[in-house]
Structures are given as structure tokens and as C-alpha cells.
């Protein structure tokens, strides 16, 4: 894990299983149905237990009968996860980059952060939204993720911890390269070695 400061905020780059994160909230790369699926979505549903599905059925029925629109987010309890909450967002499906995908992805990250603030959550873990089955090019997606997160943090005086959790070491290294390439005014705190 690599941690660094951005003003009063902490950003972390982690490699591993987001369902094991001890952040206050983890973000689920959901589909519009909110009923689970493959990848991160399926893993979170499985780890959280069947109670999660019950809460999401209620949210669908009461607030989103046609499904959660891309770029929006909803929050649920974490149930059997270490995280107390799950923030579910629907990222865009990559259609070549000419259908507003960048804006929708930006809004997906921002919607999650806005919900975190609303619920008093100051430690949130994100997967690489839309970069799996939805086909969004990784480097482009992560530049958008960073921009959305930094735009949120620069206006916040309360300290937040934002974690970017990647499935592979290669993704984590690519993300660190993107951070460096963007020339953000961050202060590297440390490399944190995991005890295995």
C-alpha cells in the first residue's frame, strides 16, 4: 500500500480484495438493476450477505423502479463486511468515448463522495469503476477518477481518506504512474508493508 497526503486528506493506493477493506464505506461498481452481477459487484453482494439484496430491492421499488441511472449513487449498510456502508454507483459502458462517458464516470465518483459527506463518512474505498466488463480504458478512467476526487477534496476542510483499491499489482503501479504524471501537489507519506 502507498499513502500520500493532499492537504489535510490522505489518499491510499492498495492492491487486494475490496470486500476486505476496513474503510468506513466501500464503493460497489453496480449495474443499474442493483441486484448484483459479476466482478466487484458479485463479490460485494456475496461477501455482504443476502440482507444487502433485501435493502436494494426496497431502494429499487421505492426510488428507482427503472434502475439506478449511470452516474448516480445510493448507500446501504455494509452487513457482513468490515465496512459499515456500501455506496453503489453505476459507471458508464465504454462506447468509444463520444457518448459522454467521461462525464458520467466523473459523476459516478463525485456522487459517491457527496453521499459519503452527507452520511458523515470520511474513509472511502473505490475500485476502478467501469474498467472491467464495461470496457472503459484503464488509464483514461483513472485520470478521471483522480480529477473527480481532487475536485471534491480541494473544497473540503474536514480530513478524508480516499483509497483506490486495485485487483492487480500492475493496476496499482499504473495508477501511481498516472498520479506522478499528473504532477499533483501531494506529499508521499510512506510505503506500507503488509504483514503476511
From Swiss-Prot:
InterPro entries: Macro_dom, Macro_dom-like. Belongs to the MacroD-type family. It comes from Thermoplasma acidophilum (strain ATCC 25905 / DSM 1728 / JCM 9062 / NBRC 15155 / AMRC-C165). Pfam families: Macro. PROSITE patterns: MACRO. This is Uncharacterized protein Ta1105. Residues 1-183 form the Macro domain.
